[in-house]
Swiss-Prot record:
Subunit and partners: Homodimer.
Subcellular location, record wording: Mitochondrion inner membrane
Domain of life: Eukaryota
Protein name (record): Mitochondrial nuclease
Pfam families: Endonuclease_NS (PF01223)
Signal peptide: none
Gene name of the record: NUC1
Gene source species: Saccharomyces cerevisiae (strain ATCC 204508 / S288c) (Baker's yeast)
Family annotation (CDD domains): NUC
One BP annotation, GO: defense response to virus
Active site: 138 (proton acceptor)
Length: 329
């Protein structure tokens, strides 16, 4: 799939309103303060609703309906969780040469677990993935969090997972993309990555109308299976010129399906504004265009095929190898 095909599908699928959770402490991820405040804007003075005894805000005395998004600050990443899809909206990482060089954690000591900070009725369950045909796909990779066991353990919360096709994607091309991101720390002293799911429309061949169609797993069905995933990469402070103020940027959108390792990574590159429209997120809006350089013009945006197979996956006793998913329409 080339970038121009992806662009045709990147239409407005907004993620919703702003965050309603605030962090109390960077290193205390479970200390989250809920602030579901009702709107404070005064009604239009031209509307004389008070004359007719109309007060819609009176509903708030029973509770504010939301939406509520769970913003959590872990050691290695920050995530914003979507209670409706039971997937993250986005996960934000920061990797450096120093963080990747550390070897203070072992994946075999980490286990997939439910995120009990999220209310039970809104969180993914371990049983939801069992025999679903999908991998529990890390959005912040465990391999990026070897600097502490706690950091690595945090990546195994299901709130950091999305259902991903295993063979040909999560265990292959997607893993190669994650390795590409880590490799950027050889040229840049700081690399920031935003990763998340997408639910993009597809043209119906019968009536030529675009529709969003995705599977939902679990019992009862509750976890949405993304059609695509995105990565926004921001590379800072090149080793050759660490004082440089501008940043090198690239955005990629990949389908949640097997991808041949022969496919060029640049085939999945998309403009940032197209990614914004498809996610409803504002990305790098504080950075002037003159300060944003094209990453793929500074480095060779190409995956390096490595044999990830299932070696790392088998190290965790909690991980079950899953059969391939049913083919989506």
């Amino acid at each position: 799939m080339c970038s121009r095909i992806l662009l045709s599908g990147l239409v407005g699928l907004g993620a919703g309103t702003g965050l309603t959770y605030l962090l109390l402490n960077k290193h205390s991820p479970t200390q989250i303060i809920e602030t579901p405040y009702p709107p404070t804007q005064k009604p239009n003075s031209n509307i004389q609703s008070h004359s007719f005894n109309v007060d819609p805000s009176g509903f708030f005395k029973y509770g504010f309906p939301g939406p509520i998004h769970d913003l959590q600050n872990r050691e290695e990443f920050i995530s914003c969780y979507n209670r409706q899809t039971q997937n993250p909206y986005w996960v934000l990482e920061h990797i450096t040469p120093e963080s990747l060089a550390a070897r203070n954690a072992d994946r075999k000591n980490s286990f997939f677990k439910e995120d009990e900070v999220i209310p039970e009725k809104f969180r993914g369950k371990l049983r939801d993935y069992f025999r679903s045909g999908y991998d529990r796909g890390h959005q912040a990779p465990a391999a990026d969090a070897k600097f502490s066991q706690q950091a690595m353990d945090d990546t195994f919360y299901l709130s950091n997972m999305c259902p991903q096709v295993g063979e040909g994607f999560n265990r292959d091309y997607w893993a190669h993309l994650e390795y590409f991101c880590r490799g950027l720390t050889k040229k840049y002293k700081s690399v920031r990555i935003v990763t998340g799911p997408l639910y993009l429309p597809k043209k119906d061949p019968i009536d030529n109308k675009f529709r969003v169609n995705y599977e939902v797993i679990g019992n009862p069905p509750s976890i949405a299976v993304p059609t695509h995933f995105f990565k926004l990469i921001v590379a800072e402070a090149p080793t050759a010129n660490p004082a440089r103020e501008d940043i090198a940027v690239a955005a990629f959108v990949l389908p949640n399906e097997p991808i041949s390792n022969e496919t060029k990574l640049t085939d999945f590159e998309v403009p940032i504004d197209a990614l914004e429209r498809s996610t409803g997120l504002e990305l790098l809006q504080k950075v002037p265009p003159s300060k944003k350089k094209a990453l793929c013009k500074e480095v060779n945006c190409q995956i390096v095929v490595r044999d990830f197979s299932n070696a790392a996956i088998k190290q965790s006793k909690d991980v079950k190898l899953l059969p391939p998913p049913k083919k989506r329409n």
